Every structure is written in C-alpha cells, then in structure tokens.
UniProtKB/Swiss-Prot annotation:
HAMAP family, A to Z: LpxK
Function: Transfers the gamma-phosphate of ATP to the 4'-position of a tetraacyldisaccharide 1-phosphate intermediate (termed DS-1-P) to form tetraacyldisaccharide 1,4'-bis-phosphate (lipid IVA).
Superkingdom of the organism of origin: Bacteria
Assigned keywords, A-Z: ATP-binding, Kinase, Lipid A biosynthesis, Lipid biosynthesis, Lipid metabolism, Nucleotide-binding, Transferase
Family annotation (NCBIfam families): lpxK
Organism: Bartonella henselae (strain ATCC 49882 / DSM 28221 / CCUG 30454 / Houston 1) (Rochalimaea henselae)
Entry's Gene Ontology cellular component terms: plasma membrane
Protein name: Tetraacyldisaccharide 4'-kinase
Single GO BP term: lipopolysaccharide core region biosynthetic process
Catalytic activity: a lipid A disaccharide + ATP = a lipid IVA + ADP + H(+)
Pfam families referenced in this protein's UniProt entry, alphabetically: LpxK
Gene name of this polypeptide: lpxK
Length: 339
C-alpha cells in the first residue's frame, strides 16, 4: 500500500507534529546510528543521487541526465535502485521489453531506457551484478541514508517548492534523518526550481561549507498542449509540479484527481476518468511515470485523448554533470590508491 505525504509535513506549525515528536526522536536516534555504519565497498566509482526527505524531489530526471552524459564520456553506467513499488525479490536486472511496473516499479523502467538498472534491497549486491554486466560507473538512485553501499560522492536533490518541509524527522516531518547528520555526510546540494525558501536553503547549505548548485525542470509533452482544457490525474509524490508543467505549456487545468505515490490504476479508475473527461469535453493529462504504470492496463486503448507529460532537467552550471563525474573519478582513484 502506498501512502501520500501528509499535508502537515509542509507546514511550520502543526499539532500533529507536536504529537508525533516522541516517535520522531526515536526514529532520528536509530537513523543516525544507521548512517554511522561503514558501508561495503565496490571496486567501481559510485555517485549517489539522493534527497533529504521522503517523497519525490526530482531525482529521476537527474539520474537520467547523468546517465546520458556518462555515456557521452565513454562510460557504461549502471543504476542501482531499490525498485520501489515493484514486487520482485532478490537481485533483478531490469529488462525494459519484458518487465513491467508491477514487478520492478515505475522509476526503474524509466531509468532502464537510458542505462543498465539492477534493483535490490542489497545495493552492494546490485552494484556487483552491474559490474558483471560490464558497467564501469555506478549511479545510485536514492540510498543515501541506507548506508548499504559506499559512495564516492553524494549529491542530494532538493525541490525548491517544498524544501525541507517543517524540518522535523519522520513521522513528525518529511526528513529521513536529522539535517545536521545528512549535511555532514553529503557532498553537495542540487536545488531544483525557485521559491521563497531558496534563500534559506542556500543559507543552510553555505553554512556547512558544502557546494550548492541550481537547476530547473523543463516541461515536455507527447502532444500539443496550448489552448487545451485538461482533466489531470497522477499518483506521484508532488503533483503540484505536474500541474505547473501543464500551465507552462499554456494548457488549462479544469479538474484534478490525485492518488498516492506509485499508485497502480485499476481499470475502474481509468474508466471513470475517461467518462468524466468525455462528460466535460476535456483532454486527459498524466505524467510519464504514471503512464508507465498505465501501460499494463486493459484500458490503454481507450485513452485516446491522453497527453503524457515528461520533464527534462536543465542545469544552471555549464557542463554540470561532466564536471561532477570528473570529481567522482578523482575521488575513486584516490580511494584505490589509499588501499
């Protein structure tokens, strides 16, 4: 079962935050101890692309961007993923043609279009499997807080619209581990988008002496959007970014239906959405991640008026991925020489 992030996580003052504080303190204690562990080391350079909080921050397009640049530089990148939302057990090498979102999760299928992807709870074992496949660079999708694989560099992604939420640790807030602990172990922050919270986020990062980088998301669509009216539906961590994508392409959002993150739409769900759209003469709109999950449905042929929205990440710093990958390789060589 997949749950949506509670609204009070994104509010500074909340009775529920106060009520859940004792549980949060206990969770924070054990999460700090977990992050103090010495993770197993794989004989490959490892770049972790994670985030500070539970829920979506925009990691997936960032991982894809690094995979593309890595291939341009001559690497054979492999992505280590938890395969969240999937049901396969053990270590599984994702096959885009034969696997589906039910088995491996939507994010793993999206990533498999651009690189080898191995999913497993045991990230070290997944990295070893990718090494056997000929990969010479590991991109770790999430996993910063799990400490299941040594990383040469940790880049944490922050959604500017949400920031660090109310600043509390789960379940009182969205943080996976106290900020102080995470800041001490990460290497740099990638802030995606703009908001009133950007200055505060920049202040916190600069105070640690770590580097801060900026990026923006570019909206892409499978069909013409301008002037069309939409019934938008999605099961993602932050649907506000999806609605913003429609508006950026001059579309009009008339109705919205949001579901829990990684939600698998039933045929009844899709049938109802199609009927509501027809009733009000609306186009349907959803995200690329949601469409991955819809493709296993028998209702796919009835979604003729569906526009799929995807996102591309644009980095403010020129050659950002190239420069950071070079830093990863420098650290990897230093690690090997120190052994």
């Amino acid at each position: 079962m997949h749950l949506s992030a509670p609204h009070f996580w994104w509010k500074n003052k909340s009775f529920l935050r106060f009520l859940l504080a004792p549980i949060s303190w206990g969770y924070a204690y054990f999460s700090r101890r977990r992050m103090a562990r010495h993770p197993p080391i794989v004989d490959l350079p490892v770049l972790c692309i994670g985030n500070f909080t539970c829920g979506g921050a925009g990691k997936t397009p960032v991982v894809i961007a690094f995979a593309k640049v890595a291939k341009e530089l001559g690497f054979v990148p492999g992505v280590v993923s938890r395969g969240y939302g999937g049901r396969v057990k053990g270590i599984h090498l994702v096959n885009e043609e034969h696997d589906n979102a039910y088995d491996v999760g939507d994010e793993a299928l999206l990533l498999a279009r651009h690189a080898f992807v191995a999913i497993s709870v045991d990230r070290y074992a997944a990295a070893q499997r990718l090494k056997k496949e000929g990969c010479n660079l590991i991109l770790m999708d999430d996993g910063f807080q799990s400490r299941r694989l040594y990383m040469d560099y940790a880049l944490l992604v922050v959604d500017a619209m949400r920031g660090f939420g109310n600043g509390a640790v789960f379940p009182a807030g969205p943080l996976r581990v106290p900020l102080k602990t995470q800041f001490s172990l990460m290497d740099s922050v990638l802030l995606i988008g703009d908001s009133d919270a950007c200055d505060y986020i920049a202040f916190l990062v600069n105070r640690t002496g770590k580097s801060l980088h900026h990026a923006h998301l570019e909206s892409l669509a499978s069909d013409k959007v301008a002037g069309k009216s939409f019934l938008a539906f999605a099961g993602i961590g932050n649907p506000d970014k999806f609605l913003k994508s429609i508006k950026e392409l001059s579309g009009h959002v008339v109705q919205t239906y949001f579901y829990p993150d990684h939600y698998f739409f039933t045929n009844t769900d899709l049938k109802n959405l199609v009927q509501r759209a027809k009733m009000h003469n609306l186009w349907l709109a959803t995200t690329a991640k949601d469409y991955i999950r819809i493709q296993t449905s028998k209702m796919q042929e009835d979604l003729k008026n569906l526009v799929v929205f995807d996102i591309n990440v644009n980095f403010v710093q020129k050659n950002f991925c190239r420069v950071l990958l070079q830093e990863v390789m420098i650290r990897f060589r230093e690690r090997k020489h120190s052994l």
